[in-house]
Amino acid sequence: MSRGERGLSASVEAAIILPVLVLFLGLLISSARISIAQQHVDSAAASGARAASLERGSRAAESAARDAVEAALVASDTGCSTLQVGVEAAALEAPLASAGSVRVEITCEASLSDVALPLIPGGVTLNSARSSPVDPLRGR
């Protein structure tokens, strides 16, 4: 039995398969974009925690962490429509020779509007939290 006798032509097969392949490719691209954006947010949180751990007080640590997070996200071209940065810097107020760490938490609303396909949301919320140790013997 030849292909013509089965009743399906190449154009009909392509018309059925092509939309599925395009949708799969779109999902693959959006998944990759989300994964890369999450890596950038993780890196920004680590940069913020490191910058905060080098400061002498809680207020300076919060400011340094926010500046470092924003700079890292701008450098990686990760656009956050909404950015929240939380800093836990109580370890900076601990007495000399006390071990501790500074923790930075980030919540970023990233846009996926340039990958506009059905079933793909227009944005995604990315969360990350990182810690950095405070040097227990540094001057306070």
Residue ranges and their predicted role:
Residues 54, 58-140:
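Short, conserved structural patches
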Residues 1-69:
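Alpha-helical assembly-interface signal, strongest on the long, hydrophobic N-terminal helix that forms
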